[in-house]
From Swiss-Prot:
Its cofactor is pyridoxal 5'-phosphate. This is Glutamate-1-semialdehyde 2,1-aminomutase. InterPro entries: 4pyrrol_synth_GluAld_NH2Trfase, Aminotrans_3, Aminotrans_3_PPA_site, PyrdxlP-dep_Trfase, PyrdxlP-dep_Trfase_major, PyrdxlP-dep_Trfase_small. Its main location: cytoplasm. It comes from the Bacteria. It comes from Trichodesmium erythraeum (strain IMS101). CDD domains: OAT_like. The keyword Hydrolase does not apply. The modification N6-(pyridoxal phosphate)lysine is found at residue 272. GO terms for molecular function: glutamate-1-semialdehyde 2,1-aminomutase activity; pyridoxal phosphate binding; transaminase activity. The keyword Isomerase applies.
Length: 432
């Protein structure tokens, strides 16, 4: 077995105290390491591709604060921009010129977005876009895909299990059945089920929402023709197509998955990268649809901190960095080196692994594959993944503490970082 030498004394003390103050000791469940076991790590600071815990241990980071840190943590251009704006105040609760700047940058970049509304999180963006789908179409039902995560709003917390996959049963206590009865589900990459749902619910479905590349049940890519098929089906049925690009937006291409796959939805949700590490979300799309949003139209949605100058500044500076020539070539090069290396090492060490990458997003399953949907992903060896995760952590490599989360690289990762990661992976996989 891998020798564990990590000193986590302070992490243990802080986490023990946190458990008396916050549910599970955390502000978001995955941070408690329930999926992988072992001592959760309490972090102290970040810089570039690295993260340090309160005990002074340094790690190469492939979580990237769950996606936003695509330029690397604490990038000086982002920090300098924030320092300058901070002197003017943290929030106005009123129109801010910086909103115009970021809005124009996003509209110029993302094919589907003609108008945009800023909010404060991806969850908030998806809540609002669902309301907008219903308002615009006059229909109540929506189709989502099993394993696709659209935040923790009641209407999206639907369990998509085998025999009850389309019955709209809630997936969390506290979510009434009547709230989710209009949420229909289908397996990802399954066009036939989507067609059947439209046939069974004529003129009742407002639209289809999905992660165009799944990142919240591990890294799962769309089959050839899947996104195009959804575009065709929704158009034929007078329904809307919504891409949840909170994770993929500005990560797998500057214009997101819709640029990468050349499929334009009607509406798009964004988050993470467009806030440069600060809390942010957004939804946007066709002008005729977005004109329904208050105060231009009757669909109400508001937010105290929406469009605040700090989040707008961090987003502007981040997008300026990403727009530089060669950015996505570099991200793809470094991520391909990592993903291909992990798959090759798995073969060398006789571990069954399925995975891949697109630009700065990657993932592996301890699973023979192929993995086309959440049911496939659930066949993974979670015990083996947990051992792999802990072994990597003990040797200074921080991966997402769940088999069902994608990984992220950044412009700050170097070939040396990748080589060290692969050398560690070989050592750990050899011990599994």
């Amino acid at each position: 077995m891998v020798v564990t030498t990590l000193n986590t004394t302070k992490s243990e003390e802080i986490f023990a105290a946190a458990q008396k103050l916050m549910p599970g000791g955390v502000s978001s469940p995955v941070r408690a390491f329930k999926s992988v076991g072992g001592q959760p790590i309490v972090f102290d600071r970040v810089q570039g591709a690295y993260i340090w815990d309160v005990d002074g241990n340094q790690y190469i980071d492939y979580v990237g604060t769950w996606g936003p840190a695509i330029c690397g943590h604490a990038h000086p251009e982002v920090l300098n921009g924030l320092k300058e704006v901070l002197e003017k105040g943290t929030s106005f609760g009123a129109p801010c010129a910086l909103e115009n700047t970021l809005a124009k940058m996003v509209i110029d970049a993302v094919p589907s977005i003609e108008m945009i509304r800023f909010v404060n999180s991806g969850t908030e963006a998806c809540m609002a876009v669902l309301r907008l789908m219903r308002a615009f179409t006059g229909r109540d039902k929506v189709i989502k895909f099993e394993g696709c995560y659209h935040g923790h709003a009641d209407m999206f917390l639907v369990k998509a299990g085998s025999g009850v996959a389309t019955l709209g049963l809630p997936d969390s206590p506290g979510v009434p059945k009547h709230v989710t009865k209009n949420t229909l589900t289908a397996p990802y990459n399954d066009l036939e089920t989507v067609k059947k749902l439209f046939e069974e619910n004529p003129d009742q479905i407002s639209g289809v929402i999905l992660e165009p590349v799944v990142g919240n049940s591990g890294f799962i890519v769309p089959d050839a023709g899947f996104l195009e098929g959804l575009r065709m089906i929704t158009k034929e049925n007078g329904a809307l197509l919504v891409f949840d690009e909170v994770m993929t937006g500005f990560r797998i291409a500057y214009g997101g998955a819709q640029e990468k796959f050349n499929v334009t939805p009607d509406l798009t949700t964004l988050g993470k990268i467009i806030g440069g590490g600060l809390p942010v979300g957004a939804y946007g799309g066709r002008q005729d649809i977005m004109s329904m949003v208050a105060p231009a139209g009757p669909m109400y949605q508001a937010g105290t901190l929406s469009g605040n100058p700090l989040a707008m500044t961090a987003g502007i500076k981040t997008l300026e960095l990403l727009k530089k020539p060669g950015t996505y070539d570099q991200l793809n090069k470094i991520t391909k080196r990592l993903a291909d290396g992990l798959l090759n090492i798995a073969k060398e060490t006789n571990n069954d692994i399925w995975g891949g990458h697109i630009s700065a997003m990657f993932g592996i399953f301890f699973n023979k594959g192929p993995v086309h949907n959440y049911d496939d992903a659930k066949k993974s060896d979670l015990t083996k993944f947990s051992k792999f995760h802990r072994g990597m952590l003990e040797h200074g490599i921080y991966l997402a503490p769940s088999q069902f989360e994608a990984g992220f690289t950044s412009l700050a990762h170097t070939e040396e970082d990748i080589d060290r990661t692969l050398a560690t992976a070989k050592k750990v996989m050899s011990s599994l």
